[in-house]
Amino acid sequence: MKKGTVLNSEISSVISHLGHTDTLVVCDAGLPIPNSTARIDMALTQGVPSFMQVVDVVTREMQVEAAILATEIKQQNPQLHETLLTHLEQLQQHQGNTIKISYTTHEQFKKLTADSQAVIRSGECSPYANVILCAGVTF
């Protein structure tokens, strides 16, 4: 049995195949996922697993150098926005790097997901609970 933190074989595989600057999306239950992008559906029911639970597990194994959010999260979901920023701040301290955070419109965000290696769908049912994580290097 795998000893690492990610037991889901699809997520583990995607993370292990990421190269520098490749992207991985963690999203809420409502984000449309392009047919051209691999979908890893973790949603069991509303809120399970939560967006932050999925982000937490993914970032335990993924080296992150940047994150892209929809600008709308600031106004429409400020509590989750703050929670995510705090998590990313703690992650950069743990990794010993600076994680660049940028924002784009939700419409542009949806277009960017088409270039990601995969989209991991959580059971989150709150607005704009989506992030594009950009892979860094560990050296």
Curated annotation (Swiss-Prot):
UniProt record, GO biological process: D-ribose catabolic process
NCBIfam families: PRK11797.1
Catalytic activity reported: beta-D-ribopyranose = beta-D-ribofuranose
Subunit text: Homodecamer.
The keyword Transcription appears for this protein: no
EC number: 5.4.99.62
Name of protein: D-ribose pyranase
GO MF entries: D-ribose pyranase activity; intramolecular lyase activity; monosaccharide binding
The encoding gene: rbsD
Keywords noted in UniProt: Carbohydrate metabolism, Cytoplasm, Isomerase
Enzymatic class: isomerase
Organism lineage string: Bacteria, Pseudomonadati, Pseudomonadota, Gammaproteobacteria, Enterobacterales
Gene Ontology annotations for the cellular component aspect, listed alphabetically: cytosol
Pfam entry (one): RbsD_FucU
InterPro entries: D-ribose_pyranase, RbsD-like_sf, RbsD_FucU
Organism domain of life: Bacteria
